[in-house]
């Protein structure tokens, strides 16, 4: 595994971002509510709240587009866990935004999957993102 020590704050921020996306999808809360909650609950932690806020707002704004991409990849709510869907939302949104190189997005998504999801989910995430890259260049 790559040394992520130099990117500790960004890595930790993305971990919290996955939790926030999960909350958004599970409870259908608005990004602003979740952002305020996370800022209050985690104000003493070393997190990049600008990255967190920009990403979560972008996901909310791109939600229909992300959903349509998931449908085009044959990913339906009935066959995906919410945590895996959260990771896919993160990855697709990052690729739409273009702030991170695509290989970095894929590596980070696989790392997040291994941390938060079932042991084999990273294979599903990897295959889905590979399919996305082949169809959405």
Protein language model regions, located:
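N-terminal interaction/assembly modules
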Residues: 1-115, 119-122, 126-137
